Structures are given as C-alpha cells and as structure tokens.
Regions:
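Catalytic-core loop-and-flanking beta/alpha module that positions acidic residues
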Residues: 1-239
Length: 239
C-alpha cells in the first residue's frame, strides 16, 4: 500500500514540476555580477516590483497549491534535491508531501549561486499571459495543426492562453520545449526602475514617464553608476 502511494507521489511530483514555471527575482539591484550576466553588461535595466504582484493576477487554473504562488526564498546547498524524504505516506498526507517535495526541488540551487540572493515566484505554465516561440525554433506540423484547431489567438509567434481549455494540447506544448512562458506584471505593482550604467535611453524613459497618463508615471527611476573606489553600484534618482 505505501509503495503504491509512493509511486503516486513520485508521479504527481513529476507532473507538477513539468507544468511549473519559475519567475526569478533578487533581493538586491546592486550586484555587479548580475548586472553583467542578466542585464547585457550594464546596458539593460532592473525592475523592482511589489512582492504581492502575482496575487493580483486572476487564477485561471487551480493546478498548483497556493504556496507555489507566493514568493519563495531560494536555499543554497552542495547537494541536489532528491525524493529520499518520502516517508510514512498515507492517503491523508500524500498531497502535502507532493507539494513539500516540489517546493524543495524548485527552491534549491548550488552554493555557487548564493550571491544572487534569489527569490522565486512559482506558477503553472497554464497561467502564463503569453506564450512565445523560442528564437530559432519552428513548430512541427502536427503541433501547428493542433494550434490551428484550438481557440487560441495568435500573437507574434505566440498565443494567449485564456482562450483555450484543451489541457491535452498544453501537455503537448510543455513537452515540446519550444516556447517561452511570459507573465505580465500589473503596472501598479512596479515600484522602481534602475537603468544600467551603460543604458543609453534614459531621456526617452523619463520623457515618457512624465506624461500623467502613462501607466508608469508613478514609478521612480534611478540611473546606476559604477563606483570608482569600491566594487559597488551607486543608484542616483533621475525621476
């Protein structure tokens, strides 16, 4: 009986992980390595959002626990996550064990990444606002036919998910690994924008935000500069 439940839990874990997307955030906007790696060597931007931003989004599918929809601090370790923690499974606790082990897997990274100070917002792929074909990828004919037959609205090599309830179709999409799953952040949940030290369109951003009708009129804008005496970033408010 317990062996059967363990197999059920393992199957549920794999199913949950296959349908889970991770949106990564950091506690800091000042890390030099992250500006180099994730912001095109200081030419990009860093956006600060409210920690409850995803709670304001409508829940279209109840495929993951509410716990997976909140910010989760990433833990760092030298050992990978495994399923050895599956013990004393019964019908009453199998769902909790599934979620706990999924969280362990989705919030664990190697010690080498500790400098990122990462927090993760974990959501179902089904709750993506927009799904876009990865650069250089093409959709196989069979999958394209499925898309054409569904109630999906095409948008620039992608489609919106709100018009399709064909879960089997989405299973095919997930397994194809052809798409990026994107989530919109409500404008009122954006607090600050940090422009990289080599970002060259500062005036364009400021002039746009000055318009009282602009959805980001309320957002504070900072220009980052590399400190000349310390290995640090200085953020100077420009709007």
């Amino acid at each position: 009986k317990e062996e059967e439940l363990k197999k059920v839990v393992e199957r549920n874990i794999k199913g949950t992980l296959n349908g889970a997307g991770v949106i990564s955030f950091s506690e800091t906007h000042r890390n030099l390595l992250m500006w180099a790696h994730y912001a095109d060597n200081h030419e990009g931007i860093c956006i600060e959002v409210e920690t409850d931003w995803s709670k304001s989004k409508p829940r279209l599918y109840d495929t993951l626990s509410n716990a997976l929809h909140s910010f989760q601090r990433v833990k760092y370790d030298t050992r990978r996550a495994d399923y050895s923690d599956i013990v004393e499974i019964n019908v009453q606790n199998q769902n909790k064990i599934t979620i706990d082990l999924c969280m362990k897997h989705l919030t664990l990274k190697s010690d080498e990444w500790m400098y990122e100070k990462e927090h993760r917002n974990i959501m179902s792929f089904l709750e993506a606002d927009y799904v876009k074909l990865k650069p250089g990828k093409t959709i196989p004919k069979e999958l394209r036919n499925r898309i054409n037959k569904s109630k999906i609205k095409y948008l620039d090599n992608g489609y919106t998910t709100t018009e399709c309830s064909d879960l089997e179709f989405f299973d095919n999409v997930f397994e194809s690994n052809l798409f990026m799953y994107l989530s919109k952040v409500p404008a009122n949940k954006i607090k600050r924008i940090y422009l990289g030290a080599r970002f060259n369109e500062k005036d364009k951003i400021i002039n746009a935000f000055k318009n009282p009708n602009h959805p980001l009129h309320h957002v504070e804008v900072f220009k980052c500069e590399i400190n000349n005496s310390r290995f640090e970033i200085d953020a100077i408010r420009v709007y």
